[in-house]
Amino acid sequence: MQGTPDYYDMINIGFGPAGIALACALEEAAHRPLETGQCLFLDKHPNCAWHPEFLLDGTDINHHLLRDLVTPRNPQSRHSFAMYLKEHGRLYQFGLLGRPASRNEWSDYVAWVGKAFASHVHYEEEVLEIRPVTEDGEIQLLLVMTSRGQYLTRNLVLSSGSTPNIPSQFEQMDCARVIHTSRYLSSLEGLDRQAAWAFAVVGSGQSAGESIIDLLNRFPNAQVTSIHRSSGFKIAQLGQFPNQAFHPDRVAYFHKLGQAEKAMILEEVKSTNYSGIDVDESQALYSLFYEGLVSNQPRLALKIFTHIESASQTPDKLILHTCDPYTLERSSVEADYVFLGTGYKQDYVPPLLSQLQPWLSLGSDNGVQVEQNYRLTTAPSFRPAIFVNGLSERSHGIGEGQSFSLLAMRAGILTHSLF
């Protein structure tokens, strides 16, 4: 180690929407902790683009525009979506649009807010390791080791987002031909648009459905096989009453429940955020399916009640070995490329905390225990504070998953706890 690492009162890992919302809350706090220069945000990416690999034409956000980075916490914030529209001269025009913001526009909004904090962010700096610093028999500080240097802190916030969910059958496969939707657009670069590709898409949620529509439109001679463990695509629960699951008041109720009760509630409300598509997407998918029947040239095949038992590959094909769990009939699907619309997962213990695990309190599910203010429960001899920002669905409810619903409110709670 050359010299003493720089010290920061807070280091936040990840500068996507959760990290940006925290920066907004810190800036707007009465004591202005950002102005002291003692808050550092680290991100391994070159910018703060929101889902850049899945910004597909014709797609829009599936939450209300008031659930932006700041409005639920501070409706007067300069970082609201309304202020973004005003700054770009589109406020009145957007009011006439009659539909949600497009995903491209929402990504531009997120980037617009992120740019306001450029002086506090180190982009393209990946956190490699976090080590405990011991003094007088206790852990006093954390040493954050990155691709560029080292830093010390007493307060660490993980805003690093969820991990792509890769089913075990595909973990050892050629990643150039088995593609999670988190790598979707870049994986298509260089593919012949006119070739008669055989694509397989795994999953029953929004990303799977949107992938199918895009592939069929982008590659007019391609065939797509849509593979589902269940009975196929279903409409997500978009009604007002089911979506009260995302209300901030539900967090305290959910947090005090036992692990078994939490699991039951998550199972009950998952259709509000997972494994569902919206009405427009369902209509588009079925239209593509039906047009194939009319023309007698079907390009979309649906395989329901299909469990992928294993996958293998030849020099030029991927082969998915499947089984119907009810009839036990086995079959196979051959494809040039397999796209995984299988969503994301939250690790029970974030990998970056592996060296700190001896001091972390684990629950009955062997996951980190998260207090209501998002601080991890640690041993008495562990003095630093570690907070999770968007990684606490199992402890706080479905609003803490892949959703903007609680971003702003959570950022306010974190700011109060940190400073």
Question: Which residue stretches match the model-derived regions?
Answer:
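A short alpha-helix-loop-beta-strand transition element characteristic
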Residues: 53, 74, 94-97
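Flavin (FAD/FMN) cofactor-binding and adjacent substrate-gating region
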Residues: 59-92, 250-257, 261
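Short, solvent-exposed coil/turn linker segments
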Residues: 33, 57-69, 180, 324
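N-terminal beta-loop-helix "entrance" segment that forms/cooperates
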Residues: 50-58
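Flavin (primarily FAD) cofactor-binding/catalytic cores of flavoenzymes
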Residues: 1-46, 95-206, 210-231, 235-419
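Charge- and polar-rich, low-complexity intrinsically disordered segments of small proteins and propeptides
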Residues: 47-49, 72
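Tryptophan-centered motif/residue detector
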Residues: 50, 81-84, 112
